[in-house]
Amino acid sequence: DCAGMAADIFESYEVTIVSGLILGLALVAIDPTHSLKWIVYPLIIRAIGVISSILGTFTVPIWESFPLKFLRAHDAEEAMFRSYEVSSVNTIFFSFLVAILYAGDWKLAMLTSIGVGLAVVFNPLTSYFTSTRRPPVKEIVKSTRTGPATTILSGLSVGMESSVWALGVIVISFIIALLLYGSQGATYVLYAVAMVGIGMLSHTGNNVAMDSYGPISDNANGIGEMAWHDMEDAE
Protein backbone atom coordinates (compact mmCIF):
# COMPACT_ATOMS: atom_id res chain seq x y z
CA ASP A 1 0.00 0.00 0.00
CA CYS A 2 2.87 2.39 0.76
CA ALA A 3 5.68 1.27 -1.57
CA GLY A 4 3.99 2.21 -4.86
CA MET A 5 3.11 5.77 -3.92
CA ALA A 6 6.44 6.28 -2.15
CA ALA A 7 8.36 5.13 -5.23
CA ASP A 8 6.33 7.40 -7.51
CA ILE A 9 6.68 10.51 -5.36
CA PHE A 10 10.39 9.82 -4.80
CA GLU A 11 10.84 9.73 -8.59
CA SER A 12 9.16 13.14 -8.86
CA TYR A 13 11.26 14.34 -5.92
CA GLU A 14 14.49 13.51 -7.75
CA VAL A 15 13.33 14.59 -11.21
CA THR A 16 12.53 18.11 -10.01
CA ILE A 17 15.94 18.64 -8.41
CA VAL A 18 17.74 17.22 -11.46
CA SER A 19 15.77 19.49 -13.79
CA GLY A 20 16.53 22.47 -11.54
CA LEU A 21 20.26 21.67 -11.58
CA ILE A 22 20.36 21.22 -15.37
CA LEU A 23 18.50 24.48 -15.97
CA GLY A 24 20.68 26.16 -13.34
CA LEU A 25 23.76 25.04 -15.26
CA ALA A 26 22.26 26.59 -18.39
CA LEU A 27 21.66 29.84 -16.52
CA VAL A 28 25.27 29.88 -15.30
CA ALA A 29 26.30 30.02 -18.96
CA ILE A 30 23.76 32.76 -19.71
CA ASP A 31 24.35 34.86 -16.57
CA PRO A 32 27.03 37.50 -17.24
CA THR A 33 28.41 37.02 -13.72
CA HIS A 34 28.46 33.21 -14.18
CA SER A 35 26.96 32.93 -10.72
CA LEU A 36 26.66 29.45 -9.22
CA LYS A 37 23.60 30.56 -7.23
CA TRP A 38 21.35 29.01 -9.89
CA ILE A 39 22.80 25.58 -9.06
CA VAL A 40 23.43 25.93 -5.33
CA TYR A 41 20.08 27.51 -4.39
CA PRO A 42 17.93 24.45 -5.32
CA LEU A 43 20.25 22.20 -3.29
CA ILE A 44 19.97 24.46 -0.24
CA ILE A 45 16.17 24.57 -0.54
CA ARG A 46 16.01 20.80 -0.80
CA ALA A 47 18.13 20.50 2.37
CA ILE A 48 15.89 23.02 4.17
CA GLY A 49 12.84 21.02 3.11
CA VAL A 50 14.25 17.77 4.51
CA ILE A 51 15.06 19.36 7.87
CA SER A 52 11.67 21.11 7.98
CA SER A 53 9.91 17.80 7.28
CA ILE A 54 11.70 16.16 10.21
CA LEU A 55 10.87 19.05 12.54
CA GLY A 56 7.24 19.10 11.40
CA THR A 57 6.86 15.36 11.96
CA PHE A 58 7.92 15.72 15.59
CA THR A 59 5.14 18.28 16.16
CA VAL A 60 2.31 15.88 15.22
CA PRO A 61 1.59 14.66 18.80
CA ILE A 62 1.31 18.15 20.31
CA TRP A 63 -1.73 19.34 18.33
CA GLU A 64 -4.24 17.11 20.11
CA SER A 65 -3.68 18.97 23.39
CA PHE A 66 -2.49 22.31 22.02
CA PRO A 67 -3.27 25.23 24.41
CA LEU A 68 -4.95 27.38 21.75
CA LYS A 69 -8.33 25.84 20.93
CA PHE A 70 -8.57 27.19 17.38
CA LEU A 71 -5.30 25.39 16.53
CA ARG A 72 -6.13 22.19 18.40
CA ALA A 73 -6.51 19.09 16.20
CA HIS A 74 -9.68 17.03 16.54
CA ASP A 75 -8.37 13.99 14.68
CA ALA A 76 -5.18 12.53 13.20
CA GLU A 77 -5.75 14.19 9.82
CA GLU A 78 -5.86 17.67 11.34
CA ALA A 79 -2.73 16.94 13.38
CA MET A 80 -0.85 15.91 10.24
CA PHE A 81 -2.06 19.00 8.39
CA ARG A 82 -0.87 21.23 11.25
CA SER A 83 2.57 19.61 11.23
CA TYR A 84 2.71 20.08 7.45
CA GLU A 85 1.95 23.76 7.88
CA VAL A 86 4.73 24.08 10.47
CA SER A 87 7.18 22.57 7.99
CA SER A 88 5.91 24.92 5.30
CA VAL A 89 6.32 28.08 7.39
CA ASN A 90 9.84 26.99 8.33
CA THR A 91 10.81 26.33 4.71
CA ILE A 92 9.38 29.62 3.44
CA PHE A 93 11.13 31.62 6.17
CA PHE A 94 14.55 30.13 5.51
CA SER A 95 14.10 30.23 1.73
CA PHE A 96 13.74 34.02 1.94
CA LEU A 97 16.85 34.22 4.11
CA VAL A 98 18.86 32.18 1.61
CA ALA A 99 17.43 33.99 -1.43
CA ILE A 100 18.14 37.46 -0.05
CA LEU A 101 21.40 36.88 1.81
CA TYR A 102 23.03 34.37 -0.54
CA ALA A 103 21.42 34.58 -3.98
CA GLY A 104 20.48 38.26 -3.80
CA ASP A 105 17.21 37.59 -5.62
CA TRP A 106 13.97 37.60 -3.61
CA LYS A 107 12.07 36.20 -6.59
CA LEU A 108 13.70 32.81 -6.03
CA ALA A 109 12.13 32.68 -2.57
CA MET A 110 8.79 33.67 -4.07
CA LEU A 111 8.98 30.69 -6.42
CA THR A 112 9.79 28.37 -3.53
CA SER A 113 6.93 29.84 -1.49
CA ILE A 114 4.50 29.35 -4.38
CA GLY A 115 5.48 25.68 -4.60
CA VAL A 116 5.18 25.18 -0.85
CA GLY A 117 1.82 26.97 -0.83
CA LEU A 118 0.68 24.76 -3.69
CA ALA A 119 1.43 21.66 -1.63
CA VAL A 120 -0.37 23.13 1.40
CA VAL A 121 -3.49 23.83 -0.67
CA PHE A 122 -3.55 20.24 -1.88
CA ASN A 123 -4.15 18.97 1.67
CA PRO A 124 -7.60 20.51 2.31
CA LEU A 125 -8.48 20.06 -1.36
CA THR A 126 -7.80 16.32 -1.14
CA SER A 127 -9.59 16.10 2.19
CA TYR A 128 -12.68 17.83 0.78
CA PHE A 129 -13.09 15.37 -2.09
CA THR A 130 -12.23 12.20 -0.12
CA SER A 131 -13.55 12.75 3.41
CA THR A 132 -16.72 10.90 4.40
CA ARG A 133 -17.86 14.07 6.17
CA ARG A 134 -17.81 16.19 2.99
CA PRO A 135 -20.54 16.63 0.32
CA PRO A 136 -18.70 14.91 -2.61
CA VAL A 137 -18.41 11.55 -0.82
CA LYS A 138 -21.92 11.89 0.62
CA GLU A 139 -23.18 12.44 -2.92
CA ILE A 140 -21.52 9.21 -4.07
CA VAL A 141 -22.98 7.34 -1.09
CA LYS A 142 -26.44 8.69 -1.91
CA SER A 143 -26.11 7.62 -5.55
CA THR A 144 -25.46 3.99 -4.51
CA ARG A 145 -29.09 3.72 -3.45
CA THR A 146 -30.30 3.99 -7.05
CA GLY A 147 -27.99 1.44 -8.66
CA PRO A 148 -24.47 0.79 -10.00
CA ALA A 149 -24.81 3.08 -13.03
CA THR A 150 -25.45 6.21 -10.98
CA THR A 151 -22.70 5.19 -8.56
CA ILE A 152 -20.14 4.96 -11.37
CA LEU A 153 -21.27 8.24 -12.93
CA SER A 154 -21.24 10.03 -9.59
CA GLY A 155 -17.77 8.72 -8.74
CA LEU A 156 -16.39 9.71 -12.14
CA SER A 157 -17.87 13.20 -11.94
CA VAL A 158 -16.44 13.82 -8.46
CA GLY A 159 -13.05 12.49 -9.54
CA MET A 160 -12.98 14.73 -12.61
CA GLU A 161 -14.10 17.75 -10.60
CA SER A 162 -11.31 17.23 -8.07
CA SER A 163 -8.77 17.03 -10.92
CA VAL A 164 -10.00 20.32 -12.36
CA TRP A 165 -9.48 22.12 -9.05
CA ALA A 166 -5.99 20.66 -8.66
CA LEU A 167 -5.04 21.58 -12.23
CA GLY A 168 -6.43 25.08 -11.75
CA VAL A 169 -4.22 25.68 -8.73
CA ILE A 170 -1.17 24.37 -10.60
CA VAL A 171 -1.88 26.59 -13.61
CA ILE A 172 -2.16 29.65 -11.35
CA SER A 173 1.24 28.88 -9.81
CA PHE A 174 2.81 28.53 -13.27
CA ILE A 175 1.31 31.85 -14.37
CA ILE A 176 2.84 33.59 -11.35
CA ALA A 177 6.21 32.01 -12.16
CA LEU A 178 5.86 33.27 -15.73
CA LEU A 179 5.10 36.79 -14.50
CA LEU A 180 8.16 36.79 -12.25
CA TYR A 181 10.70 35.68 -14.87
CA GLY A 182 8.85 36.00 -18.19
CA SER A 183 10.79 39.09 -19.25
CA GLN A 184 14.17 37.35 -18.90
CA GLY A 185 13.77 34.58 -21.44
CA ALA A 186 12.54 31.03 -21.85
CA THR A 187 15.35 29.40 -19.85
CA TYR A 188 14.57 31.59 -16.83
CA VAL A 189 10.87 30.69 -17.08
CA LEU A 190 11.66 26.97 -17.21
CA TYR A 191 13.94 27.37 -14.21
CA ALA A 192 11.15 29.22 -12.38
CA VAL A 193 8.74 26.36 -13.04
CA ALA A 194 11.36 23.89 -11.81
CA MET A 195 11.76 25.90 -8.60
CA VAL A 196 7.99 25.81 -8.05
CA GLY A 197 8.18 22.04 -8.40
CA ILE A 198 11.07 21.83 -5.95
CA GLY A 199 9.11 23.90 -3.45
CA MET A 200 6.01 21.76 -3.94
CA LEU A 201 7.93 18.55 -3.23
CA SER A 202 10.20 19.94 -0.52
CA HIS A 203 8.16 18.13 2.15
CA THR A 204 8.01 14.74 0.48
CA GLY A 205 8.84 13.11 3.81
CA ASN A 206 5.62 14.49 5.29
CA ASN A 207 3.66 13.38 2.23
CA VAL A 208 4.90 9.79 2.41
CA ALA A 209 4.21 9.68 6.16
CA MET A 210 0.67 11.01 5.65
CA ASP A 211 0.05 8.49 2.88
CA SER A 212 1.30 5.65 5.09
CA TYR A 213 -1.13 6.59 7.85
CA GLY A 214 -4.09 5.10 5.95
CA PRO A 215 -2.72 1.58 5.36
CA ILE A 216 -1.15 1.41 8.83
CA SER A 217 -4.36 2.42 10.63
CA ASP A 218 -6.42 0.13 8.39
CA ASN A 219 -4.18 -2.86 9.11
CA ALA A 220 -4.18 -2.07 12.82
CA ASN A 221 -7.98 -1.94 12.76
CA GLY A 222 -8.11 -5.30 10.97
CA ILE A 223 -5.84 -6.88 13.55
CA GLY A 224 -8.01 -5.42 16.31
CA GLU A 225 -11.19 -6.85 14.76
CA MET A 226 -9.64 -10.31 14.43
CA ALA A 227 -8.54 -10.09 18.06
CA TRP A 228 -12.16 -9.28 19.08
CA HIS A 229 -11.28 -5.92 20.58
CA ASP A 230 -13.94 -3.32 21.30
CA MET A 231 -14.35 -0.04 19.41
CA GLU A 232 -12.85 1.84 22.35
CA ASP A 233 -9.57 0.01 21.81
CA ALA A 234 -9.68 0.78 18.09
CA GLU A 235 -10.02 4.50 18.79
PLM regions: where:
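Hydrophobic packing and interface segments
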Residues: 2-235
